[in-house]
Design a protein with these regions (language model features):
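Cytosolic small-GTPase signaling regions in large eukaryotic proteins
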Residues: 1-105, 109-112, 117
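Conserved ATP-binding subdomain of kinase catalytic cores across diverse folds
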Residues: 73-229
């Protein structure tokens, strides 16, 4: 799905337009009806997310949450119509609806959306993703692919960095989907817990790890991973 969206978007490129058109035509020819129908559903889902993102960004700050709640209704209507859809960010996952109460937006400059889908697998957990508009996620995709390659090399050499490499998919120029890592904590938040001069202290992160990894084996695993980065 991601490749078809990028190829369609790339048809506006001046120098390689004809090549992208040929690649897209070949992909669509080989896909068959069932896969083409799935591509159409995912494309419509991305279009709705893009429209919601634009409306949330254009709304005044006090009205943004209300606008988001209203626009989430479009996603609910979408799933009522198509029943299920594969998640473009991870085609192995199938989604069947929206957890309205778990949806929100982040207050950073680009105002990305946090969207939580209901897993079509009754045994699976709900799936949260970030929809970003205004950033070129093609660069993020490249960096994450390089990190994945490096992590494979490190593991082959016996260096386990305890890496969690999240998924990222550019769905067009300046927009895309990012996997939300459960229970992730930013360095900024860790530093804030240590007070004003927290970022200047050498043991800030080590102390935080110690507080949140009570088992000796877990703490040693974290320390070993940190040491492997040096």
């Amino acid at each position: 799905m991601g490749s078809t969206l990028l190829l369609k978007d790339a048809q506006n490129e001046t120098y390689f337009k004809s090549w992208y058109q040929k690649l897209l035509a070949a992909l669509q020819f080989c896909s068959g009806k069932a896969l083409s129908d799935e591509f159409s559903k995912e494309k419509k889902l991305i279009k709705i997310l893009g429209d919601i993102g634009e409306k949330v960004k254009s709304a005044s700050d006090p009205q943004r949450q209300e606008v988001l709640k209203k626009e989430i209704g479009r996603l609910e209507e979408f799933f009522q119509c198509i029943k299920t859809c594969h998640l473009p960010l991870n085609p192995a996952l199938c989604i069947k609806g929206i957890d309205r109460d778990a949806c929100s937006y982040f207050t950073s400059h680009a105002l990305p959306l946090k969207i939580t889908f209901i897993n079509a697998n009754p045994m699976g957990k709900n799936i949260s993703i970030i929809f970003k508009a205004g950033d070129d996620l093609r660069q993020d995709m490249l960096v994450l692919q390089i990190i994945q390659v490096m992590d494979n090399i490190w593991l082959q050499e016996g260096l386990d960095m305890q890496m969690i490499i999240y998924r990222c998919l550019s769905t067009g120029k300046g927009q895309g989907l990012v996997q939300m890592v459960p229970d992730a904590i930013t360095l900024a938040k860790i530093h804030r817990h240590s007070g004003l001069i927290g970022p200047l202290k050498e043991n800030t992160i080590k102390k935080w790890f110690s507080q949140h990894n009570h088992l000796k084996a877990d703490y040693e695993k974290v320390c070993l991973a940190a040491a492997n980065f040096k």
